[in-house]
Amino acid sequence: MASDINRRRSFSLLVLIIVMLYGHKGDSKCDFEAIFNFGDSNSDTGGFWAAFPAQSGPWGMTYFKKPAGRASDGRLIIDFLAKSLGMPFLSPYLQSIGSDFRHGANFATLASTVLLPNTSLFVSGISPFSLAIQLNQMKQFKVNVDESHSLDRPGLKILPSKIVFGKSLYTFYIGQNDFTSNLASIGVERVKLYLPQVIGQIAGTIKEIYGIGGRTFLVLNLAPVGCYPAILTGYTHTDADLDKYGCLIPVNKAVKYYNTLLNKTLSQTRTELKNATVIYLDTHKILLDLFQHPKSYGMKHGIKACCGYGGRPYNFNQKLFCGNTKVIGNFSTTAKACHDPHNYVSWDGIHATEAANHHISMAILDGSISYPPFILNNLCSP
């Protein structure tokens, strides 16, 4: 698997070099002026913690050296994409101080779902900022930008231009919580029943953004959550349910079902939207390969979390998450981070490390996991 991916990426890199030498407009800037992101904790750059301030502990230790509103030890995929396109990190839409929206906004929040939650954050842990809410925030943001320019309001220096919405990337990395939140309680087969509704909501959101001017959409598929320490310790299973890499077979089969349906739905959406670019990003392929062959990427640990409690094989405890402290067996215990997160695929049993995010980002940028082919690296001048 690792060699197949490497061959594909080598071919994509060759195509990229040829295009840059013969087909690139040397005097152009980025084809895209902004990024508008919709998602959950996999792409939240601080929205959740702006709404519910509390983050502490080892989060952000690798790059930011302190908690930075991200569910990782460092940068996320969206951070790498923004920087590669010559943009600053995306400001969270919910952040009131220090935001700069000239190059887009991030509507993602930790624990968000595609479907509207039927319970509260404090009962289920699910964010109130579902995809529908994020879409409404995007629409209101556009209204405010248009009005601010028309009325020459103060604060224009931190807002994008009125024409930016047709020259932006719209990225979606959401759906994981819809899949995992009910997994332990109702099982894989019952979760699969509502996955078409999840995908339909994503496609519908793309169509609504197209209606207000959006033309380029990138949709990241669902990760192989059957390899996540949090799922491996929280989902009842036998040894027969595990593949040779230690991942849950029935869970990852359901993920594959979701991704196949997502790809098919996006293909149909692509035919319905004139002059739109709708890209399916198979980030699952890279992340699965990272879990299965970490050494091929210069890493050591696949299904073991860097930050957690419990030791081998998963270093994850359902009652003691990364950075938290509680009394276990009459002793105060803290779920601490490892000293070398660059050697781990899993940061906290639920999210990827910066190192894993970097590998995934490089595959997105070189076009090796884009369907149809879409070499994002080629859209900016050197």
Swiss-Prot record:
Its main location: secreted. CDD domains: SGNH_plant_lipase_like. The active site is at residues 41, 348, 351. One of its GO terms (cellular component) is extracellular region. One of its GO terms (molecular function) is hydrolase activity, acting on ester bonds. Residues 1-28 form the signal peptide. Glycans are attached at residues 118, 263, 275, 330. It is an enzyme of class 3 (hydrolase). Its EC number is 3.1.1.-. Keywords: Glycoprotein, Hydrolase, Lipid degradation, Lipid metabolism, Secreted, Signal. GO terms for biological process: lipid catabolic process. It holds the Pfam family Lipase_GDSL. It is found in: Secreted. It comes from the Eukaryota. Belongs to the 'GDSL' lipolytic enzyme family. PANTHER family: OS06G0160200 PROTEIN, ZINC FINGER FYVE DOMAIN CONTAINING PROTEIN. This is GDSL esterase/lipase At4g01130. It comes from Arabidopsis thaliana.
